[in-house]
Amino acid sequence: MEAVKLTQLVSCAGUAAKMSPETLAQVLRYLPEINDPNALVGTNTADDAAVYRISDEQAIVLTVDYFTPVVDDPYYFGVIAAANSLSDIYAMGAKPLFALNVVGFPKKLPPEILATILKGGADKAREAGIPVLGGHTVDDAEPKYGMVVCGLVHPDKIVKNHPPHPGDSLILTKPLGIGVLTTGMKRGIVPENTAKKVMEVMETLNDKAAEVMVEVGVSAATDITGFGLLGHLKEMLQEEFGAEIYLTKIPAIEGAWEFAGMRVFPGGAKNNLNYLLPHLDFAGEFAEEEKLFLADPQTSGGLLMAVSQEKKEELVKKLQQKGVLAAEIGIITGNKGKIVVKR
C-alpha cells in the first residue's frame, strides 16, 4: 500500500476542525426546547453526551464524535479517533456498551487505508471492552472518521459539566499542547520523539480517570477537546460561576511551549480565544502565545474535574495510583462568568 500523508489531504486536523463556538451557539439557538422528562441531558448545557432515562435504574448515554486526520498513520488515526469518541462517555461517568463507525472517505484513496483506520478504531474499542456493531460511510472529499458510542449510567449518578461549586479545585488529567503540536506535525517540523509523546497522550483512554472520578465523587466534569481548556471550562461555569486558573500549574506536553512560541497554532485556537475574550481577565502581562495555548483545541484531551476540598486529596491520590496525571490548575469562584488567569 502506497504511503499517503493523511494530514495533507485536509484543511484542518482533528478537533481543531470543530465549528467555532460562536457559530455553533448561533445555530443551536434555533433548536426547539426539549420538554421530555426522560431527557436528562440535552443541548442546553453543552454537555459531553446526551442522556435519556429508560428506567429508574438505567439511562442511555449517547455521543457522536468524528474528525479529519490528526496524524498521517491510518491505524493511529483510527485509534485516536476512537479514544476521543469514547471520552465523552467517560466524562459523563458512564460505562460504554458499544460503538458504531462514522466514515467519510475519498474515492481516490485505496480502500486498504480505510480498512486500516477501522482496524485502529476496533482495536481501541476492544481495549475499552466494547464491540463495534456497525456504522455508516459516505464519499467525501476529505477523510473523516469517528464513532457513535452508546453507554449506560444510573440516572442519579450522571456526572454533568455543570454546576461546579465555589471553592472546588480544578483537576486536569492530561497535559495540554495537542493542537499546537499536531499542527506542527502536519507541517513536518516536530521531532519524531515529540510526535511520539503527542500520540501517546491522544491514544490514552480516559477510562481510569473516570473510574476514580465516579468512585470519589466530583461536582462536575468535562473532557478537554476542540474548544480548548478555556472553552470547556467556560461551559462548566456558564454565567453562574467563575474560576481562577494558574498558568504555571497547567501541564504541557514536552516541546509544546517551544512550538507555541513559534505561533504554530491551528485556526481554532484563535477562534476559541476571540469568542472567550469578554469572559477572560488576564492578571498581569501575558504573551499572545500564552493566551492561545489555553484556548488550543485538544484532540482526545484529558478530563477536567471540579472537586470539593474535602475530596480533593483522595481524588488526586487515587488518580496517581492509577498512573493518571492529576494537576491542580485552579479553583471555582463566585465571580460570575469570569475566568481569571494568573501565573
Swiss-Prot record:
Could you tell me the Gene Ontology terms of the biological process aspect for this record? selenocysteine biosynthetic process
What is its biological role?
Synthesizes selenophosphate from selenide and ATP.
Cellular component GO terms, alphabetically?
A: cytoplasm
ATP-binding recorded as keyword? yes
List, alphabetically, the Pfam families matched: AIRS, AIRS_C
Keywords associated with the record:
ATP-binding, Kinase, Magnesium, Metal-binding, Nucleotide-binding, Selenium, Selenocysteine, Transferase
Q: Which HAMAP family match?
A: SelD
- Per the UniProt entry, the disulfide pairs are none
Catalyses: hydrogenselenide + ATP + H2O = selenophosphate + AMP + phosphate + 2 H(+)
Q: Which cofactor does it need?
A: Mg(2+)
Which EC number applies? 2.7.9.3
Question: In which residues is ATP bound?
Answer: K18, T45, A46, D47, D65, D88, G135, H136, T137
Q: Which residues bind Mg(2+)?
A: D48, D88, D223
GO molecular function terms here?
A: ATP binding; magnesium ion binding; selenide, water dikinase activity
Protein name (record) = Selenide, water dikinase
Organism (species):
Carboxydothermus hydrogenoformans (strain ATCC BAA-161 / DSM 6008 / Z-2901)
Instruction: List the InterPro entries.
Output: PurM-like_C_dom, PurM-like_C_sf, PurM-like_N, PurM-like_N_sf, SelD_I, SPS/SelD
